[in-house]
Amino acid sequence: MKKTNLLFSGLLSSGLLFGSLAIVGCTDSKPDAETTNPETEMSTNIAWQDSQARFTVIADGVIRMEYDKDGQFCDNPSFIATLRQYPKANFTVKETEQMVLISTSKMCLSYKKGSGKFTADNLAIQAEASLSKSFTWHPGDTPQNNLGGTYRTLDGYDGSKYYSWDHNKPGQGQELPLEDGILTRDGWTLLDDSKGLLFDGDVNDLSSAELPWVKERKDDTIDWYFMAYGHDYKQALHDYTLFADRIPLPPRYVFGYWWSRYWSYSDAEMRQVVKDFQEYAIPLDVLVVDMDWHWVEPGKGGWTGYTWNDRLFPSPEKFLQYLKQNNLQITLNLHPADGIPAYEDKYGQLAEYLGMDPLSKETIPYDGSNPKFMRGWLDKILLPLQKQGVDFWWLDWQQQLNDNRIPALSNTWWLNYCIFDNQRRTQPEHRPMLYHRWGGMGNHRYQIGFSGDTYSTWASLAYQPYFNATASNVGYGYWSHDLGGHMFVNYNDKLDRELYTRWMQLGTYLPVMRSHSTKNANMQKEPWKLGSEFQPAVTASIRQRYKLAPYIYTTAREAYETGISLCRPLYYDYPEAEEAYDPEFRNQYMFGSQMLVAPITEPMVDGVSKVKIWLPEGLWFETATGTMLQGGQIVERRFLIDEYPVYVKAGSIIPTTGSDVKNLASCSDKVCLDIYPGNVESEGQYYEDNGNDRDYDKKYAVTTFKTKYEGKKQIINLGERKGSYNGMPARRSYSVKIYGVPAPTEVLLDGKSVDCTYIPEELVVLIELGEPDPECEHSLQITYPEGMPELNNGLVGQFRRMKNTMTQMKYRDAGINFCEGLGEMGSISEALLYFPEEFASRIQQFQDNYNQLPQLLDKQKLSPENKQFFLDDVLY
């Protein structure tokens, strides 16, 4: 941190020492009790101002610092900071003849009165003792450990290295210049909005259809936001949303599967895609139609286009109607940069609106900072297509980065705002929705992100988990990546099906699950075209996504409330653990609050993926194998193609979809509570709302669940549903699925006996609860038998692998007759089901036999090749 010199005479008498390790007058200061205010009460929170300086306490961890030589302070919303009213903050102001000291529970700001523009000689901020990281800041100091933000696009990147298809383009092989984020390990951040663009009106006043417009700032002003948080990164993100606004909750369908391919699909071909998904019982929510929906041939269309190609889509209305009948959403690709040529259907209407002569046939240029053009483009060009049934736009801006009229105005940022906020004002029945690239700070308000055209390589797969989670550091928590990569390194390459499978398995645990690829006949990513080795795993990844939809949607609500995104770096939860920052483990991330994902980013060796994983403190349940692992250590784990490294905190309650679904359109789907092993008290929630209305901020419902153990009894409480919304079902069907337990001896629901189903291959008990009254609390009590062996030591994985391998052995040796000990291992699941009274002895027998597997294979008299195959295949 930069050091400064002693300030001025009289400094010590004021109790302030700039440039030293402490600001004496601030030490141990506490807010006065009378400054406490209800959080719901809003205020400007201006703490102090004079003719040139103004300080606003946004929260105890955020102070806004403004300087203007004429005293014309900025109350307009900016592109970053759209909110100017805040929950009332707790702070104290102390003044001497020379100094003003503003104290919160986290920091103390000291400023020399009347000293003009902020410098290291007249302004300082010191951390209070409550922070986990001490610091003293002066203007000019720069944090040394920024944790990163995000970047506009991954177009042309192979992993983090840039390689344009045009080899003459500069920058080949350069590292992606990831932008800084909000968070630093130094414990503080300064956001400089001094040159940031403004709005000329309140963007949250939706009473008018007219969009507040861009406004440039005065020169030579200072507008800083100082954030103090120590290592409480989650609080910092929440504080950021107090002035930058919240992360909107996307429609529920966003969290389903998206099918996308750059391909000149016809109406009939698109319908066949839908039918294929239905035939293979693969859920689907969003169809993405790339640029061939409009004319692309010279004289009728091109890169930009707004007129349907009626050779491919004879009746767009009927095509869109078909999608609605199948509960599917559709987005169309837009490239607005080339303007609106005379051959577009709506050219005449827009020309007249803009005062041009339609007979001139002059192309109407794209002119984003012209409010007349933007209003005409939105109303005359896009709105008719939306009325036909287009749900949202894929805005694929790849051209000029900045506006011609206002050089500081990013075309990407501005388009995101204009389209998204126009929907807020003109489509009150649905949530705004947009799919576009990152435009810069403040773009967290305009999801969803489109990360662009990456190469289909293991390097690209390896980079995306880190890139994705790190974007949470600027609140940009909804990146959508081209799963499987967009393009080959060499056009004639073939799809690497293993790579695509691992990418899809990652996609299950990303904010958006969307396949996409360029126009290449070898890029066939339809699950049913992947062959028997990979199709089951890819299909399972999509179904698992839908199973987790209630958990994902609940976590998305959390992002709206707190600013903490669905995928978040490990240092949010484990800020004092060095491993959380270690580049070796940077691909690991938390998926919501209960799941840790450790992506597989390298090809298998001999059919096995080995992954080195850091598990934080605590107990973690490996879902692929049913293994409970002790945290606080680095482990190496092995996985087959149908397995993926996901770890759930011990005792977690995860709301999941309780039945097979085709899409996420319904509010009435059954919910299953997945309860994971762990003799701990724990709690979980299920969030629900209408799914796509605008009232989710107030109209929603939450149900809380708790579990605890009392000896051999597990008690699960279902809380009362609190809240309501339009379309809420009167009752909902529930089930409970408890992992890693033996078959219970008794199950009571509100004191009455109920049946259960035991699933031995998963070591799971499934209890159907029917439709419990949501206005009452309910108690589920499960009693387990005494004397049970340990079940959460990998048995589930061993069961599955043994069964599969023994089946494969019959194809290697059709005459094989499994010997005693080995044969029983292949039918363990059935034995547990048929002979529940022998549960403990059968489990013990399996474990003993498994421990002696090499000897049993010798007893079986397998050939050396077959013995090695067997051991390798079960990952012995």
Predicted feature locations:
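C-terminal motif of bacterial Sec signal peptides marking the signal peptidase cleavage site
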Residues: 24-25
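Catalytic and substrate-binding clefts that recognize carbohydrates or anionic sugar/phosphate headgroups
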Residues: 94-251, 261, 267, 274-279, ...
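Catalytic core of carbohydrate-active enzymes
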Residues: 420, 441-449, 463-464, 471-481, ...
